[in-house]
Design a protein with these regions (language model features):
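Polyanion-binding interface signature
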Residues: 1-111
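Charge-biased C-terminal accessory regions appended to nucleic-acid-, cytoskeletal NTPase
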Residues: 83-146
Length: 146
């Protein structure tokens, strides 16, 4: 089995080297748990808007792990943000293979099989897919913040 902390460190390195990363993106990496978010998404304490994945003992046992988008308690006008965001992006998310709309602060989620063979590549693909939601997040944040 691969060293998962090392896998997450490698993913962080690749993300940071991406051409788009310097446009206000941040990473919170705690071993086998990672969030990707923009600086204006109210996620300074990991409780705002972010894309998230983790592979902890439960996921290893289940041989599957999630990648998701959350709008947690630090998101301004959280309920309104979620409602407006889903109105805007629901169809796009539903068109993505394997993605499900969530409940509460969990906007959407995909559960991936835990295959160590191309784990880094799979996670990069999913983070890049979720990044397509950036413009919608920005648009709705502007509406609910003012």
């Amino acid at each position: 089995m691969k060293d998962l902390k090392n896998v997450f460190r490698q993913i962080e390195k690749v993300l940071r080297r991406s051409s788009w990363f310097d446009d206000g993106w941040e990473i919170y990496n705690r071993g086998v748990y990672m969030q990707l978010y923009k600086t204006n998404w109210h996620n300074q304490n990991q409780g705002g808007i972010h894309f998230e994945t983790f592979i902890e003992p439960r996921e290893i046992k289940q041989k599957a792990f999630p990648i998701c988008m959350h709008a947690e308690e630090d998101c301004p006008s959280q309920d309104e943000f979620i409602q407006q965001f889903l109105t805007l992006e629901r169809d796009r998310i539903k068109s993505w293979k394997g993605y499900q709309l969530g409940d509460g602060y969990s906007i959407c989620k995909r559960t991936l099989p835990l295959n160590f063979k191309n784990l880094e590549q799979r996670l990069m693909e999913e983070f890049n897919r979720l990044r397509q939601l950036e413009a919608g997040i920005e648009e709705i944040l502007q509406r609910v913040e003012y």
